[in-house]
Amino acid sequence: MNRRNLLKASMALAAYGSVSASGLFAARALAAAADGEIEHFDFAELQAHAKKLASKGYVSNKQVLPPVLANMTPQQFNAIRYDPNHSLWKDVHGQLDVHFFHVGMGFKTPVRMYSVDPQSKQAREVHFRHDLFNYENSGIDKNLVKGDLGFAGFKLFKAPEIAINDVVSFLGASYFRAVDSNKQYGLSARGLAIDSYAKRQEEFPDFTKFWFETPDKNATRFVVYALLDSPSATGAYRFDIDCQAGQVVMEIDAHVNARTDIQQLGISPMTSMFSCGTHERRMCDTIHPQIHDSDRLSMWRGNGEWICRPLNNPAKPQFSAFSDTDPKGFGLVQSDHEFSSYQDTVVWYSRRPSLWVEPITAWGEGEVSLLELPTTGETMDNIVVFWTPKTPVKAGDSMNYGYKLFWSPLPPVSTPLAQVHATRSGMGGFLEGWAPGEHYPTTWARRFAVDFNGGGLDRLPEGTGIEPIVTVTHGKVQDFNILVLPDIKGYRVTFDWVPDSDSVEPVEMRMFIRTGDRTLSETWLYQYFPPAPDKRKYP
């Protein structure tokens, strides 16, 4: 799962039947880069084609690249630049445009690109050719690059920064990303996840073809269609992409067909990285206080409950499932955008976007699945989140999921109650204000501090009694304290977890705060990994 080495299988499928060339001049005027024969395109036909494809055996079309491309470095790959004079909508002179990625390095699968006239529904393929790219600074001899190699992916631009800063990128398997107002890429989404945490090896479906509706000159939204293929599934996707001033909003219509029985189907998957944060310091022996693309999983359950689950970098793979019916939304959040929290001047974790999923069709019963993997470096994605339907997926099944993706600094919706501001963890068994030095506590314990703010906490009458409601799956909790935090206009709840056995199984913790019968906050969930019994001691 190295974000920089996405080496997945892909497939190029037969094109739709050709039509007459009567619309050739109009099609060329709309997309000068498109040079293929005119074909008919319709989303309903794409759905039918994907369903029919699922009834046939899978055939991989991964190609063997010329050595000059297969062996090039990441620096060489990035140095091959798409020529903006051949952008897909250069002749439209509008607000939107598309550039393509060259194949090479780990991106070996040909992805086919098409330009579509939305009025006539005529489509033409954009074939790979040398004049679409600038090789000058790459050290690559383009004369050694032969044949129609297809493309690796594409990126989208919007005025006023056309050909300067891209706002959306699709590259590798079914991965895609977008930026927000901070103009910094972070976590990724995927078209589909299959068996991410199952007995058999994880499968990475590929987007094998894309169709781009040519926009009007004043249009501000991209419309892109995609064909997905893999050994276990096919899919037809429609992306309506609105690149707004402060966020990117994608409305996705996904039609998925099972080619085989699927043990674990992941809908609207997202992939991120969490190395260390305020509560997890195991891998933070650097100058950086925190290193992560996302710090929490946020969920708005179908029953209205809001949940905050801080992410972990565990010592071994951990899988958590949160049952729900018709979820209102969920996502991976980068809640802290202060430079001082990261001290990073290279990849700018303080500028990373959050990603929120909002279902727009009924998703029924299922679970939000969270996979956390150990990572030793920030280039390895180790967090995966997706929706898994409760009903087992059998060969021949077809499913439709509609949803929106919001790429923004923070999710577009939030609870009216108090939210978790931060989670911290450290040595327990002593009074706050005391620091280890002359002596240590005699009993080992682990302390947790959870800060809440918002939701009117700063407007509670003086003397209001606040009660933390805490449950744990094993061990016991004690030594509660509730502290006012004026700097965040909220409260801090601290407590100690004390083991009652030698078990090293993860402790599932759950907490919210209330006053009387009134709930004041969202629900905090946390997974703690106790040390081995012989490590439960102080110096």
Curated annotation (Swiss-Prot):
Keywords: Periplasm, Signal
Secretion signal, residue range per the UniProt entry: 1-29
Pathway named in the protein's UniProt entry: Glycan metabolism; osmoregulated periplasmic glucan (OPG) biosynthesis
BP term (GO), one: beta-glucan biosynthetic process
One GO molecular-function entry: catalytic activity
Post-translation changes: Predicted to be exported by the Tat system. The position of the signal peptide cleavage has not been experimentally proven.
Compartments (UniProt record): Periplasm
Disulfide bonds: none
Major localization listed first in the record, in broad terms: periplasm
Alphabetized Gene3D superfamilies for the sequence: 2.70.98.10, Immunoglobulins
Record keyword Ribosomal protein present: no
GO cellular component: outer membrane-bounded periplasmic space
Alphabetized PANTHER family for the sequence: GLUCANS BIOSYNTHESIS PROTEIN, GLUCANS BIOSYNTHESIS PROTEIN D
Function description: Probably involved in the control of the structural glucose backbone of osmoregulated periplasmic glucans (OPGs).
Entry's family note: Belongs to the OpgD/OpgG family.
Name of the protein: Glucans biosynthesis protein D
